Design a protein with these regions (language model features):
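A cross-family phosphate/adenosyl-ligand binding-site feature
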Residues: 1-119, 125-397
Length: 397
């Protein structure tokens, strides 16, 4: 993903976290964004404008009446140029001004004039943040369409422990991506995505599982959320960074996955079953650790619930997309799955094809639909995710 052709305006106010915004500005430039920065006068006490000028290649604006600038009505030109505004750190003072339409410096004037998406990241002492006045002002910003990024908790600069920390750089970047990186062509759709492996316990120590990392399912959930959908992510244990979705549902077993999906299915418009759900589980789970003994150990297994096999015949207009990982006869097996489970689409791949296995950041997939098969080239899983959503959107119309 990149931000080429997009202008991101950073508004930096006078909090101790102001210095952290240098890394954000640098990261945005590396992603191809055109970055403009406006600082309040108090912010210049924590980090100098020249730092941002060096990182962005633009003059850092502070003074509303700066004469050493090209002849334009600056607060209007910047407001029109920006595709998104991020005010971070947003102090209690700046939040109060924005909430009440006060425009007494360059930053608040531009924010008031701008019509683009506006993101606000409060960062301050816990007592200031939790003060009812500040909370009312934050609620006012949300009422007027601002997106408020929740503060993180931890040890603050004042040594207090509590909420009020500026979120990490990747969180701020994620909010920017959500605002402008992709068209909101999935707005209004409720999409459930499953991801990752399941774990079927054998005893208190061991379980049966597979090699799935959840990368493909997480990529679909992330892309759907960025494109405006209300996303429910139902996932097995993974080591991946959490995805910001409408509802996050962690599970462990296939039975838990079955219950999580079936209980929500009636409310969904689309289900993308990207999880690698176990087909079998131990028929009995030992209460204590199974001890090593001479000779072999035989484990009786039983079938787990067939999620798509259950909901496919019962669907009422929902779009069902299954996944099929094969090692041979991929097209035949995946086509049979499409028909047997009453699916609208199957995303098939062959584990033996280079770049299509577990744990990698790429995939080689074939879309199986009632119209036939369409093979895609080697792509990143992020690009595959968008291709899947494009196909779903096209076929729902």
């Amino acid at each position: 993903m990149d931000l080429k052709g997009k202008c991101v305006l950073l508004g930096v106010s006078g909090g101790i976290a102001a210095y952290k915004m240098a890394n954000v500005a640098s990261a945005l430039r590396k992603l191809g964004a055109d970055v403009e920065v406006i600082m309040t006068r108090n912010a210049t006490q924590f980090i100098t404008p020249i730092t941002f000028e060096t990182l962005t290649g633009h003059k850092c604006m502070v003074d509303t009446f700066d004469r050493d600038f090209k002849f334009e009505v600056t607060h209007i030109s910047l407001a029109k140029k920006a595709d998104v505004i991020l005010v971070a750190p947003a102090t209690a003072n700046v939040i109060a001004k924005m909430a009440h339409g006060i425009a007494d410096d360059m930053l608040t004037t531009v924010v008031l004039a701008a019509k683009c998406p506006k993101l606000v990241s409060p960062a301050m002492n816990t007592g200031m943040l939790e003060n009812p006045i500040t909370q009312d002002n934050i609620a006012t910003l949300e009422k007027y369409g601002f997106t408020v990024i929740p503060s993180e908790s931890g040890v603050l600069a004042c040594k207090d422990v509590g909420s009020g920390r500026l979120p990490k750089e990747d969180v701020l970047l994620d909010y920017i991506f959500r605002a402008i990186a992709k068209p909101k062509d999935l707005a209004g759709l409720r999409i459930a995505v499953t991801a990752g492996p399941t774990q079927e316990p054998l005893d208190p120590v061991r379980y049966l599982t597979n090699h799935s990392t959840g990368k493909m399912g997480y990529a679909v959930a992330r892309a759907a959320a960025m494109r405006g959908a209300e996303v429910t992510l139902i996932h097995g244990p993974t080591a991946l960074q959490p995805v910001r979705v409408t509802e996050d549902v962690p599970i462990k077993t296939a039975q838990q996955m079955y219950e999580a999906v079936t209980s929500r299915f009636d409310e969904m418009d689309v289900l993308v079953m990207a999880a690698a759900v176990a087909d079998y589980r131990p028929a009995a789970v030992a209460d204590d650790k199974i001890k090593k003994k001479d000779g072999d150990l035989s484990i009786a297994v039983e079938r787990t619930p067939d999620i798509l096999g259950t909901i496919g015949p019962k669907k009422k207009g929902q779009f069902l997309c299954g996944f099929s990982m094969e090692t041979r006869d991929m097209l035949a097996n995946s086509s049979a799955k499409l028909e047997k489970k009453n699916l609208d689409m199957v995303v098939a791949n062959n584990l033996k094809v280079a770049g299509a296995g577990f744990g990698v950041d790429t995939n080689v997939v074939t879309f199986i639909t009632p119209d036939g098969a369409r093979e895609l080239p080697l792509m990143s899983k992020d690009d595959v995710a968008d291709a899947i959503l494009d196909e779903i959107l096209k076929r729902r119309k």
